[in-house]
């Protein structure tokens, strides 16, 4: 091991300017005094390069009860205790976490300053450079100085592989996947209770351009990763470990928790082998220790002396930077999420002098998270899922007298395999007009900057690559709810105040708003007033600027507003806030960058197009170009050719099998068909419905639309990313699998038998994936939109019949469709020669006919598709 050199280039002999990167528990010394070690980044003060150091900090003496809680048992022992029930085991974990968290966040006045990681501080050390004696927030340090210093360091990318023993079930009991879910919660917890372990470990660290592989006790390799310094403190010998060139360790969200824990245990044994002094605490808390699982978050209270976290996939891991790591840690608002509410900081809100009385803006506070979806009650008609689960044949919606905003909540069929119970419904909005997605770009960041001091959180740090500032701010606000209720409520109230006034102003100006998400994203139609057309973008921008100045005063303009994209007016809300439609629903890459929508089944994966998107296609991209297309330019391209033509099999020797390399052009779609996931493909097809259904369609035309979805599925049938879904732990039947994976949100695919198959992005697609479940779900969405569209047309025509006492009988063709001033499609009623009763009777008959036609088309095309998938499995 190499010895750490002494400190250099101080502004004062004992003073350093920099930032705390991580606090970890070293141990208890004499008189129950806790010792915390601090990984500190010295900014260098412009005289030297930034350097990493490890110091120790004394905590306040612990009471005997907390000392016993620390010494009594490790996290693993508490989680696997056989003499206690599940509730008692959880209480034991929470009690241990509360003691450790209190010391690491509030153990002393110095620790309270250093616990606010990645914010500038000034410290003073003793003469030997071992203990921090004083610490205070650094004033006048530019944000750019911290960002520039972090850019010189890396994140260590860790990948661990290994072997597992066979799990032998007792002879008298056979544990099916269903019984595992009922009795153990997750496979991971069952394995923990039975002493599951890993062996033959091999680990790889990538730091910058260097890669280090450890398969044995290679101290020479470890010396390049960690510097070791032995010091004497309070008559005790300590060994301080400092990372070389990196400030955090990242793993993929598919890394087995057991392998990760075993890897750090092995490194601990090597680094402290033969050490006669007191080693640091070695413990681990992860989702595998909870009976029903938890967030994919890891808490190593003692060793390693760096933060450890997961990112979304190997590709993202390889691009992780130190700035991303800082953003991830800042978003925790304290310790990793797995620690729970006890691991969050107390943040005091700023005292605001607002131009609006408190009772006017505080009423808009809500417990909903930052990514919550708010639906317009007049645009969406909600219905509970009925007991009759016939294949997508919902009852007609009641007539609320609102013909322009026709939405119904529809039961979905999943073939027995679906995410949690909220998956049982769809909520659909369809309107023949261009819907705009208006974004208030920096609203959340600017409100947070007004409400929280920079020493608690600085929203203006430059993040890069994986994380966007908004995602970091959103997660930080979410974590304020646990121990900083006043700050959380203040921020949520101000965001809600602006958001509610935006939607109210839209309604007053004659604009139909359909949905808002996260206080900053609005789906709005243009409108008309007595003076002419009204732009949704102009309306939102004006309202935001007005109420921003009303709240905060001054000449500072309000947050930036812009139309992010526009598309046909089709939106489907699937289950709990999952959106499907012809829009760019991008949800980040996990971690702090991941929206809440990404942590549930059906969150969209980021798709990429190799070139510019064609004008009629909106698919998933990381950044929207704004404006977008109508989504209806490729109307009837999928009507012919059959599955073999779409799959590219041609006449390949008479074989029924197809080539997996079929180009997207074979779909009859645009180049962008190769991007996004299966929900993106469905959303693209949904965007074609308004243009297609302006005239009465035949069964063959309906079949062509369903077949287009099927063609897209066939072309991507071997693409793992296309089919992946993200499932919550303990909520589904999961097939047995190697390792410890299903204890946290994990990636998987549906199986035909109703189970979930754990699926890695980096392995071949499971052979028994349930393509039929995906087809069933996609066709259910399309059928729901077709039915709602028919109701919109017919409710508009019903309003028109009130002007006359009778109507003519419907002809064989659908009556002509015109566009009203508000952009809503209307059906011209027949001439006043038949009674209104006859018109209503014919209307209901047409609705039933269209619904039945759509269902028959879906069943026929689904039968074709399932036969094809079976032949080409």
From Swiss-Prot:
Keywords: DNA replication, Host nucleus
Family indicated by similarity: Belongs to the herpesviridae HEPA family.
A biological process from GO: bidirectional double-stranded viral DNA replication
Compartments, record wording: Host nucleus
Domain of life: Viruses
Subunit annotation: Associates with the primase and the helicase to form the helicase-primase complex. Interacts with the origin-binding protein. Interacts with the polymerase catalytic subunit.
Organism, as annotated: Human cytomegalovirus (strain AD169)
Region of interest (Disordered), ranges: 394-422
Gene that this sequence comes from: UL102
Source organism phylogeny: Viruses, Duplodnaviria, Heunggongvirae, Peploviricota, Herviviricetes
Descriptive protein name: DNA helicase/primase complex-associated protein
Signal peptide start-end: none
């Amino acid at each position: 091991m190499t010895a750490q050199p002494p400190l250099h280039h101080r502004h004062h002999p004992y003073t350093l300017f920099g930032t705390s990167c991580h606090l970890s528990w070293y141990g208890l010394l004499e008189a129950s005094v806790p010792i915390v070690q601090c990984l500190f980044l010295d900014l260098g003060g412009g005289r030297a390069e930034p350097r990493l150091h490890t110091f120790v900090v004394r905590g306040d003496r612990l009471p005997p009860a907390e000392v016993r809680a620390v010494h009594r048992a490790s996290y693993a022992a508490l989680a696997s205790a056989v003499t206690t029930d599940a509730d008692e085991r959880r209480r034991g974990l929470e009690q241990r976490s509360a003691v450790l968290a209190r010391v690491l966040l509030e153990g002393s006045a110095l620790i309270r300053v250093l616990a606010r990681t990645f914010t500038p501080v000034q410290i003073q050390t003793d003469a030997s450079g071992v203990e921090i004696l004083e610490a205070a927030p650094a004033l006048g340090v530019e944000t750019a100085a911290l960002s520039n210093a972090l850019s010189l360091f890396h994140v260590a990318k860790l990948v661990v592989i290994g072997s597992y023993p066979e799990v032998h079930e007792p002879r008298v009991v056979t544990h099916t996947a269903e019984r595992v879910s009922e009795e153990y919660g997750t496979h991971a917890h069952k394995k923990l209770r039975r002493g599951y372990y890993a062996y033959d470990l091999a680990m790889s660290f990538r730091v910058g351009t260097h890669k280090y592989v450890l398969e044995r006790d290679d101290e020479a390799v470890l010396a390049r990763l960690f510097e070791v310094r032995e010091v004497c403190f309070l008559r005790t010998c300590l060994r301080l470990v400092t990372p070389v060139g990196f400030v955090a360790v990242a793993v993929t969200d598919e890394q087995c928790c057991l392998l990760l824990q075993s890897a750090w245990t092995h490194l601990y044994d090597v680094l402290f082998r033969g050490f006669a002094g007191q080693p640091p605490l070695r413990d681990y808390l992860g989702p595998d220790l909870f009976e029903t699982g938890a967030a994919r978050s890891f808490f190593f209270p003692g060793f390693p002396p760096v933060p450890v976290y997961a990112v979304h996939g190997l590709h993202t891991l390889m691009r992780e930077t130190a700035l991303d790591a800082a953003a991830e840690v800042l978003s925790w608002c304290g310790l990793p999420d797995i620690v729970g509410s006890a691991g969050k900081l107390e943040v005091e809100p700023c005292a605001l002098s607002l131009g609006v009385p408190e009772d006017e803006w505080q009423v808009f506070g809500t417990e909903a998270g930052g990514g919550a979806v708010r639906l317009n009650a007049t645009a969406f008609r909600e219905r509970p899922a009925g007991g009759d689960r016939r294949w997508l044949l919902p009852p007609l919606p009641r007539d609320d007298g609102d013909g322009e905003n026709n939405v119904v909540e529809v039961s979905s069929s999943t073939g027995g395999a679906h995410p949690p119970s909220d998956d049982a419904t769809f909520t659909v909005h369809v309107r023949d007009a261009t819907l705009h997605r208006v974004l208030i770009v920096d609203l959340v960041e600017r409100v947070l900057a007004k409400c929280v001091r920079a020493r608690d959180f600085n929203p203006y740090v430059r993040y890069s690559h994986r994380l966007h500032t908004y995602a970091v701010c959103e997660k930080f606000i979410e974590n304020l709810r646990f121990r900083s209720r006043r700050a959380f409520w203040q921020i949520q109230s101000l965001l809600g105040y602006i958001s509610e006034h935006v939607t109210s102003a839209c309604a007053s100006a004659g604009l139909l708003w359909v949905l808002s998400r996260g206080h900053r994203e609005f789906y709005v139609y243009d409108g008309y007033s007595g003076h002419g057309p009204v732009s949704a973008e102009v309306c939102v921008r004006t309202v935001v600027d007005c109420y921003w100045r009303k709240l905060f005063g001054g000449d500072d303009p309000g947050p930036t507003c812009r139309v992010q994209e526009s598309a046909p007016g089709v939106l489907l809300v699937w289950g709990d806030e999952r959106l499907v439609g012809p829009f760019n629903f991008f949800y980040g890459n996990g971690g702090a960058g991941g929206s809440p929508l990404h942590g549930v089944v059906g969150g969209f994966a980021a798709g990429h197009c190799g070139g510019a998107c064609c004008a009629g296609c909106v698919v998933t991209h990381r950044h929207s170009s704004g404006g977008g297309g109508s989504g209806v330019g490729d109307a009837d391209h999928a009507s012919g050719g059959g599955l073999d033509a779409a799959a590219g099999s041609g006449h390949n020797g008479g074989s029924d099998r197809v080539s997996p390399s079929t180009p997207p052009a074979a779909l009859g779609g645009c180049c962008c068909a190769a991007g996004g996931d299966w929900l993106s493909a469905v959303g693209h097809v949904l965007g074609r419905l308004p243009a297609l259904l302006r005239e009465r369609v035949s069964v063959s035309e309906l079949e062509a639309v369903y077949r287009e979805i099927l063609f897209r599925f066939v072309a991507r049938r071997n693409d793992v990313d296309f089919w992946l879904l993200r499932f919550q732990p303990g909520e589904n039947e999961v097939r047995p699998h190697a390792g410890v994976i299903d204890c946290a949100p994990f990636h998987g695919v549906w199986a035909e038998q109703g189970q979930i198959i754990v699926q890695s992005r980096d392995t071949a697609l499971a052979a028994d994936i349930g393509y039929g479940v995906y087809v069933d779900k996609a066709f259910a969405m399309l059928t729901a939109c077709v039915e709602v569209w028919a109701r919109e047309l017919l409710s508009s025509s019903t309003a028109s019949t009130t002007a006359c006492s009778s109507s003519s009988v419907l002809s064989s063709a659908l009556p002509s469709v015109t566009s009203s001033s508000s952009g809503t499609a209307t059906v011209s009623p027949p001439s006043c020669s038949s009674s209104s009763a006859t018109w209503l009777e014919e209307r209901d008959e047409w609705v039933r006919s269209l619904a039945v036609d759509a269902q028959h088309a879906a069943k026929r095309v689904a039968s074709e598709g399932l036969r094809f998938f079976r032949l080409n499995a």
